[in-house]
Regions:
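Ligand-binding cleft/hinge of the Venus flytrap
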Residues: 52-61, 135, 140-176, 280
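A ligand-binding cleft/hinge motif common to bilobed small-molecule-binding domains
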Residues: 87-101, 190-215
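Immediate post-signal peptide segment of exported/extracytoplasmic ligand-binding proteins
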Residues: 27-37, 138-146, 285-299
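Short helix-initiation/N-cap motifs at beta->coil->alpha
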Residues: 42-43, 64-77, 176-187
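An extracytoplasmic/periplasmic, membrane-proximal ligand-sensing/linker region
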Residues: 46, 161-193, 206, 227-229, ...
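A conserved helix-loop-strand patch within extracytoplasmic ligand-binding domains
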Residues: 104-155
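Short, well-ordered beta-strand elements
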Residues: 31-44, 62-67, 146-150, 249
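A bilobed periplasmic-binding-protein/Venus flytrap-type ligand-binding module shared by bacterial periplasmic
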Residues: 117-127, 229-242
Length: 299
């Protein structure tokens, strides 16, 4: 092989390398930036964000980045544009303080499902003795609960409302014992096994109502409000930049019975496995949550 031929082959190889490199760079440049979805380590939220993430990646080929942090940090990051949306804003009561603080920099994409919060007790606690939050002041009742109100993380919306309930109902001698979702429920489970009473901050939908027989206490002062709605909230301007994603969240729906069943399945295996199986079985329903015209433009 003479030098001229060798030179031509090397030149062709070099140019081919440049072409492939340019093609790869162009493809990389055309890739969509990820939608950053914030979430809190709550059982219902994990199912919701992972179902949404699966659907977005499947139907829109939309990369998704999940960012986990406490709810207060999520609101601040959303308002500052450091994340794009959070699908677990409980209104009108639970997250009212956070929402009121940042609402001018947020977009409400819609309601995903409904819920409820409040103080709850196992059904083994007689209704005749404790039916209402007011009954916690009856003689001898505080001692049966060891003066404890078990709650999840300190400082979240429900924790703040419970502080208000202690003040408004004048629950003298009661203290909030904050830990985590699992810590709160583990202590309640230990108490049940020892035939001890428990008073907990509960919310639904949640798998706790499937595993244990619980009931909410009446709340005549409506500190915890009535029915709650769980909203998907985005940063300002998100729906204009990502209309197809905003449309999906505006049409996202998940029956409460399905959500609670998924949470139980996640405990028995993993959330990823539960979500994958549910999504595969309900793929057609999720397809209906997208706008066909917007989807065709994004592909």
């Amino acid at each position: 092989m003479n030098a001229h031929v060798r030179y031509r082959k090397k030149a062709c190889a070099y140019l081919l390398g440049l072409a492939l490199g340019a093609s790869a760079a162009l493809t990389h440049a055309e890739e969509k930036p990820p939608v950053r979805i914030g979430w809190v380590n709550w059982s219902d939220t994990e199912i919701t964000v992972k179902l949404a993430s699966t659907a977005l990646q499947e139907h829109l080929k939309q990369p998704v980045k999940l960012v986990m942090a406490d709810i207060g940090i999520q609101f601040q990051a959303l308002a500052n544009g450091n994340i794009d949306l959070i699908p677990m804003v409980w209104l009108p009561s639970t997250h009212k303080a956070f929402y009121d603080k940042y609402k001018d920099r947020l977009e409400d994409l819609g309601v995903l499902y409904e819920g409820r919060i409040g103080m709850a007790v196992p059904t083994s606690v007689p209704v005749a003795e404790v039916a209402s939050v007011e009954d916690l002041n009856k003689p001898g009742i505080r001692e049966k609960f060891d003066g404890k109100i078990l709650t999840s993380e300190v400082g979240n919306g429900q924790y703040t409302l419970t502080v208000k309930a202690i003040e408004d109902y004048k629950l003298t001698g009661y203290k909030l014992v904050g830990s985590s979702e699992s810590g709160m429920l583990n202590e309640m489970d230990r108490n049940l096994k020892r035939d001890k009473w428990s008073l907990v901050n509960a919310w639904s939908p949640h798998w706790m109502f499937s595993k244990w027989s619980l009931r909410y206490l009446e709340d005549p002062k409506q500190i915890f409000g009535g029915a709650e709605q769980i909203h998907a909230m985005a940063r300002k301007g998100f729906s204009q930049e990502h209309p197809e994603v905003a449309y999906f969240f505006a049409h996202f729906s998940l029956p409460q019975a399905d959500l609670e069943a998924l949470m139980m399945q996640a405990r028995e295996s993993t959330a990823d496995k539960a979500v994958a199986a549910y999504y595969a079985a309900n793929k057609a329903r999720f397809e209906g949550m997208f706008n066909p015209e917007l989807v065709s433009r994004t592909r």
